[in-house]
Regions:
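Re-entrant/interfacial helical elements at transmembrane boundaries that shape
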Residues: 1, 13-22, 60-63, 93-98, ...
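Hydrophobic transmembrane alpha-helices
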Residues: 1-8, 249, 265-272, 281-285, ...
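Conserved phosphate-coupling serine/threonine residues in phosphotransfer and NTP-handling enzymes
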Residues: 6, 13, 203-206, 270
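Conserved switch/coupling elements of ABC/ABC-like ATPase nucleotide-binding domains
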Residues: 54, 273-274
């Protein structure tokens, strides 16, 4: 005699998923479907964007280091003149610092060219002016460090992110920006390890030195510096080819390609609108403890589904 309990299967699994999604919502977690909870439970790799996820995304200028005989206030004034056109939190920090110092600027530059995930390029008094990442200023634009100032450049503080300002092909200033790590960042990394995630990766547009310092501080397994938006998505594709399940956590426009490429993309609620739209799961901005809750809820869901399956099928074996 064979008894058909397929109706029990058809009922128990959707109910378990809906119950898990409802439980997640009580912790301010928005999940767009049960398969994303399954992906979180099965994931063996978590990829974090640094700015806005592991940090508070409230950067402030810590110091301005002039090069090539430039004056500190003048290079900050010039940087703010360009950065006010750039929709990025670090750019806003530069503009805010110039305003705090009373450095009001006139629009002396020509048309501004905004290069996504790189920086800003324009022309002032017939000279090309660029500001942005190390890769953009030195590799893409070919700027050089002034002679005899290499040692000064090498001594840049590692604990800060850096914006590089080049004028006429020569480095004119480095703006050091502090964006403090979330207090719970190290605890979250440790907690995810204990919950069975073997590989935690950080990606950032910051320099190698800054990325290394952050990774060592919070105990991240792998880190990649000076990455572009396409680099994050390409990394996830390579992990998929290696048979790994990948979760991506990000909050910015630049994270959107990687969020859509991951098995489940997680966005911060107060991040960029496009990141929230692309992401499969949204967490609150107050802290990262929701990640540990999400992992526990996902694991509990999969245990419940497997337990129900065994019990229902077991009736047919009796």
């Amino acid at each position: 005699l064979m008894v058909d309990f397929s109706c029990a299967l058809k009922l128990s699994m959707p109910i378990a998923v809906l119950s898990a999604m409802r439980e997640a919502s009580t912790y301010h977690l928005t999940v767009k479907g049960g398969r994303f909870l399954e992906a979180v439970s099965q994931a063996d790799t978590f990829v974090f964007d640094k700015t806005g996820t592991l940090t508070y995304a409230a950067p402030q200028v810590a110091s301005v280091i002039p090069f090539n005989g430039e004056q500190e206030d003048e290079v900050l004034r010039l940087a703010a003149c360009l950065e006010e056109h750039y929709p990025h939190s670090m750019a806003k920090a530069v503009v805010a610092e110039a305003e705090r110092r009373g450095l009001h600027h006139e629009e002396r530059h020509s048309k501004v060219e905004y290069i996504v995930a790189h920086g800003v390029s324009s022309s002032v008094d017939g000279k090309k002016v660029v500001i942005g990442s190390h890769h953009f200023v030195f590799e893409d634009e070919g700027c050089v460090i002034p002679e005899s100032e290499e040692e000064k450049f090498d001594a840049l503080p590692e604990e800060y992110s850096h914006l590089f300002l080049g004028v006429g092909g020569v480095l004119s200033a480095v703006i050091c920006v502090k964006d403090p790590l979330r207090e719970e960042a190290g605890e979250i990394i440790d907690g995810l390890h204990k919950l069975g995630i073997p590989k935690l990766v950080m990606m950032t547009g910051d320099s190698e030195r800054t990325a290394r310092s952050v990774a060592q501080t919070i105990g991240i397994d792998e880190y990649y510096s000076e990455v572009l938006p396409e680099d994050k998505a390409n990394y996830i594709r390579r992990e998929h080819e290696a048979g790994r399940k990948v979760i991506m956590l990000g909050d910015g426009v630049n994270d959107s390609p990687a969020l859509s490429e991951a098995d489940a993309g997680i966005a911060i609620r107060d991040g960029a609108a496009i990141a929230r739209e692309v992401a499969d799961i949204t967490i609150g901005a107050n802290d990262l403890y929701a990640l540990l809750t999400l992992k526990r809820v996902s694991d509990a869901l999969m245990r419940r589904i497997h337990r129900n399956y065994r019990r229902i099928i077991g009736f047919n074996l009796m």
